Amino acid sequence: IVGISGGRDSCYGLHLIVNELKLEPITYTYDWGMVTDLGRRNISRMCSKLGVENIIVAADIGLKRRNINKNLRAWLRSPHLGMVSILTAGDKHFFKHVETIKRQTGISLNLWGINPLEVTHFKSGFLGIKPDFEEKLVYSNGAIKQMRYQLLRLCAMSKSLGYFNTSIWDTLSGEYYRSFTQKSDYFHIFDYWRWDEADIDKTLRLYDWEMAPDTHTTWRIGDGTAAFYNYIYYTVAGFTEHDTFRSNQIREGDINREEALRLVADENRPRYPNIKWYLDAVGMDYEEVIKTVNKIKPIY
């Protein structure tokens, strides 16, 4: 089973699995309401050209978007950088449904195209959690770590009671499936195959892979949430996940600092069309939200 989101890394991972490993996978997509139309089209392109089946598990998209609305309203009443991640809490049930598909298909092997350079310690760092540089996975798991994380999140939530809404069960159950359930036959393909951005972009062009019209980067363009939360981080903290990603590339020796600075100067430009789509989708007023974010006092 290969998870595919329509993003760059999962699409390239599928290419490797079929063409290099010579496997015949089934792909799985969890549509929680924030997979963009562009992402869906890229999933269709990859699966069609590689001749693989795509199983789509769709959540109650209306419910998921209403949950985002409730939590975003709570966040805007008391902005906290450590709570930005609650806006993406709804996608964690991905981990629940992949186990269902494994049982139904009789396939135990689960391969993910997760890029090890995309780890972002700062997101939980804004809650007061120090980075674990020995962490083996992009997404941390384990009961003690998660209990501490949820306790710090609860403290932040107490500053805006709007967080205590009907989305709580969805959020907590998603975290349970992501962090507490035992995963078996679960591997990240880029732990074994070198991740090379230039080669990935070149390969995806062979599939007529579609780019977003409002940015030059190929990262996160199938994710409807990324443009908005990166706008928050850039406005308030002065950097985004693009900065941490490029910093990790420097540490790996993939690019130099001058190249990284040139890239993030472009990648950190606000993606207003995508932000507008996101806020419309969750039923929020675009101008009102942007004005509220812009009024937040920067921390730098």
In which residue ranges do the predicted regions lie?
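Nucleotide-activated chemistry modules centered on ATP-dependent adenylation/adenylyltransferase
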Residues: 1, 16-300
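Hydrophobic positions on the alpha1 helix immediately C-terminal to the Walker A/P-loop
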Residues: 12-13
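Short, glycine-rich nucleotide/cofactor-binding loops
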Residues: 2-9
